[in-house]
Amino acid sequence: MSLMTKLGLRALVASCLIAAGGAAHAQLNVLVTGVGSTQFPIATANFANEANSPQQISTIVRQDLQRSGKFTNIDAGSAPVSEGDSVDLGAWKAKGANAFVAGSVTKLPNGQYQVRFKLYDTVNQQSLGGLELVSPEGGLRMSAHKVADYIYAKLMGGRGVFATRLSYVIKTGNRYQLQISDSDGQDAHIALSSPEPIISPAWSPDGTKVAYVSFEKKKPIVYIHDLPTGRRVVVSDQKGNNSAPAWSPDGRTLAVALSRTGNTQIFAVNADGSGLRRLTQGSSIDTEPSYSPDGQSIYFTSDRGGQPQIYKMPASGEASGGAQRVTFTGNYNTSPRVSPDGKQLAYISRTGGGFKLYIQDLQSGVATALTDTTHDESPSFAANGQYILYATQVNGRGVLAAVSTDGRTRQVLSVQGGSVREPSWGPFMQ
């Protein structure tokens, strides 16, 4: 069986798994297992006036911090504490909290909501600042995620990804749904509903668009979907298969896998569908392109060596500098995704008859399995490079999962009564 056939079947099998789940609830349910090597103890008090708010901001913040695997929540009691209240930092330190968060939620005369908070360092007895966020009612959850991102950045020294979004595909009844949700699987909405499969969603670098493959015209066609307006543009409707869209870092170009010349090869196309040009040449199957974060290279899957492996070529095409093999652990490796810093490669490796998520240091070449499941697929890095989202199976049902790049923390995102596949983790919000 050819590589393209296998990959195509894998996509179709994923679609069948979605279908097998039946009707699906609109929200993802999150289960966190494992913790980081060290956890930062923090107490987040109930925010003042949030009892009258449509969303409990402090609860969402605590849940976000717990999901990261890097924090442990110290009980802050039930009494609300405003960012303007006098705080006994020594008392919170004595309770085991190295940081303390206080805040408030206020409904403004125009109907919007103001969220204010302050973060304290109880060890050094000082304020670490805070934010004032204003949003409509529907944006309160995102405001809470931004609070958690601020805390993460101040205490961990890197950007958090709580205020990012996910895309994934659910089969509900007889229709496929491309859904967009917050990073915790909540506040989900349907971007596209179709009676035919939808696969391979890929976020644009600015987070306003998603490219994907839809079978709505009884063949795979690549679309770009503008999320704010719902407007769609056909990017590639060539003869044969149109698949595996991947954005360039500047958002101007997509790499796609097309079979218009026979065997599947990698092409580049402008984001408006113009300027199609071929990037790989030869008789092998070349597919699943993924740009490096600097836009200079494309990683892709090819069977040119007899078995599917991951290769790297210049973004202008292999005619400009050839293609170099990247993976050497195992004899079947697919689905390359490069970390945002360009230092690591996530991919799927067939091991012992199953498919596992691996991560490889691109400098040393050392590869490590991150999971113990056997049906992993579709890896996608978080924008900060600390986590990888992927699809897998638990008890025979398709779920999404996220694992930290050190393998210590795992999240499972499932849909009640159904299966979910085809995940993609969105970029930092602009």
From Swiss-Prot:
Q: Which UniProt keywords apply?
A: Cell cycle, Cell division, Periplasm, Signal
Domain of life, per UniProt, equals: Bacteria
**GO terms for CC?**
periplasmic space
According to its UniProt entry, the protein's GO biological process terms are: cell division; protein import
Does the UniProt entry include the keyword Signal?
A: yes
* Entries under Pfam families matching the protein: PD40, TolB_N
| Main localization (coarse) | periplasm
Where would you find this protein in the cell?
Answer: Periplasm
Q: Which Gene3D superfamilies match?
A: TolB, C-terminal domain (2.120.10.30), TolB, N-terminal domain (3.40.50.10070)
Signal peptide stretch: 1-26
- Asked if the record carries the keyword Cell division, the reply is yes
Please describe the quaternary structure of this protein: The Tol-Pal system is composed of five core proteins: the inner membrane proteins TolA, TolQ and TolR, the periplasmic protein TolB and the outer membrane protein Pal. They form a network linking the inner and outer membranes and the peptidoglycan layer.
Q: What does the function comment of this entry state?
A: Part of the Tol-Pal system, which plays a role in outer membrane invagination during cell division and is important for maintaining outer membrane integrity.
Which NCBIfam families does the record associate with it? propeller_TolB
Question: What family does the database annotate?
Answer: Belongs to the TolB family.
Name of the protein in its database record: Tol-Pal system protein TolB
At the highest ranks, the source species' classification is:
Bacteria, Pseudomonadati, Pseudomonadota, Betaproteobacteria, Burkholderiales
